[in-house]
Design a protein with these regions (language model features):
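Beta-strand-dominated extracellular/periplasmic modules and repeats
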Residues: 1-127
Length: 127
């Protein structure tokens, strides 16, 4: 899917590389996807991005867009990622999802929770 992906694995014809969902009246959302893998990104020799998912949030207007990234807990590449390391220490935990058995679907899919906070001391870091 990615323009520089040279892997010979078969592509899933149902995966478009992007999705869209709306929040409910409480601001909650849910979606299903594959867990992305790490990839080399050429920033410097042997540079890899950790597993992550980009989120684009839109308000009432298309121009009111916020972008952030969600990382997965325990990823060994976080300690090398300049996007993650560029965040103040106290905000880094807000960038990492939390594994949750409550949203895990038995025999099907692991579940993670990622709360996006728009304002306040624990606001999610946006790009």
């Amino acid at each position: 899917m990615h323009k520089v992906d040279q892997h010979d694995a078969p592509l899933d014809p149902n995966f478009l590389g992007a999705g869209r969902c709306l929040t409910d009246d409480q601001g909650r959302y849910t979606f299903k996807t594959i867990k992305p893998g790490a990839y080399p990104w050429g920033n410097h020799p042997n540079a890899w991005r950790p597993n992550h998912i980009h989120f684009s949030l839109f308000g009432d207007y298309f121009a009111s867009r916020l972008v952030t990234q969600m990382y997965f807990p325990g990823d060994p590449l976080l300690q090398y990622d300049p996007m993650y390391l560029g965040a103040p220490d106290h905000l880094r935990d807000c960038m990492v999802s939390q594994f949750s058995l409550d949203v895990t679907q038995p025999d099907y899919a692991l579940g993670y929770v990622f709360d996006i906070v728009l304002r306040g001391a624990k606001a999610t870091r946006f790009e």
